[in-house]
Amino acid sequence: MKLKSLIVGALAIAAAAACSKKPAELAQGPWLGVLVVDSTEQGMEVPFNMNVYKTAAGLDSVEIVNAGEKIAITEITRSGDTLTMQLPVFTSEIVAVVGADSLKGCYYPKGKENGTCYKFYAVKGITDRFPAATEAATANIQGRWEVIENPGTPDSTVMVGEFKQEGAKVTGTWLNTGGDMRYLEGKISGNKLMLSAVDGAHTLIMTGEVTADGKIANGKFMGSPKWKSVWTAVKNDNANLPTVESLIHLKKGPKTFQFACVNLKGDTVKLSDNQFKGKVVIVTASGSWCPNCMDETRFFSELYTKYNAKGLEIVALCFEGKDLESSKKAMERFAKQTGANYTFLYAGPRGKETKDKVLYNLEGQVAFPTSIFINRKGEIVKLHTGFSGPGTGEHYTQLVEETTALVEKLLKE
């Protein structure tokens, strides 16, 4: 649904406010934000909910809400009418002119320094994520679905959709072999499905139509101007993804692993260093740009805090920009904002060539993140590719329980 027409009046007010001598206050309460990720895609603007409030110190604070997730933006600066909001964990930021009850500006998915701008609009007082879709829901998609992305093409992929529906409101996620799409929220209007998410890494919009025979057809997906697909889905309570064991395995040869990468100080760190000898080590292929890596890092941070004194070490091999200098700031921010105190190393530029070189003895799907579990003898005992985060509910709970049990078992050996 095209949302721009709903906020034209509010933006006119913003222009008038900009002409006044006193900068407009950022109004407290609920807001609806909209990102125009690709202006050539009509009806695919990406809406998201925001709440604005004052902290105890009287400072502006903004909260982005996607289904069960609340993302607090506390790094906010103001220069005249211009507001800059740095989203947590990642390098994305919003720069907008403040009107009486509106905002207008840019969402920079990789930070203002990168220069890529998605047009950003927001208006106060709207809580409906898709307010132009007013028809009562005539379909219910509660449950599990088998999702086919790009059906009938060489790029065809099977995923699992899990949704909850209350009235017209729909929440849920898509699970795939690399992880999940995190927290999706939207609605059904008539038979039309609309879902979106904005979390600092993702800018997602999904649409589709529930057919008379209960399928979902004419699905469209967009995550960026270059990340687009079509999809269909059928209800399937038994829909499942391939097992991790079928996706990734070790090449023939020694069941060991070695790395030599630089830390944030530029010093070379090796798995053969004394720091890791006789320890249980988790090595994870990660990246400061990766939302599923963020979810894994937060969990691994808890594991490290609980078990480091008992002999657990965790190393994140980060695949980033062209060199450490250009990647250091994002890596430091990622580690700090996820609360991770374990070892972060620069593994090289993001890309298949570097990944294949660093993770030299892994075969199959090596997604971000991919984790290697190593016992006290230095032997690889388990590989895990992808990460199903907290947005997947019971899948996340099961993964946390299984991983924790494995770590405890290895520490006792």
Which residue ranges define each predicted feature?
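Structural microenvironment flanking redox-active thiols in thiol-disulfide oxidoreductases
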Residues: D295-G339, R350-L359
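Thiol/disulfide oxidoreductase modules built on the thioredoxin-like
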Residues: Q337-A340, Y346-L406
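Surface-exposed beta-loop interaction hotspot
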Residues: T116-E149, V244-L250, T256-Q258
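A short acidic/small-residue loop/turn micro-motif
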Residues: G111, F276, F387-P390
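Central antiparallel beta-sheet cores of small beta-barrel/beta-sandwich binding domains
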Residues: E25-V98, F130-A133, A139-T211
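Bacterial Sec-dependent N-terminal signal peptides
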Residues: M1-P30
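N-proximal helix/coil linker or "cap" segments that precede and/or mark the start of modular domains
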Residues: M222-V262, N274-G278
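Short active-site neighborhood of thiol/selenol oxidoreductases, capturing the structured segment around
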Residues: V269-M294, F300
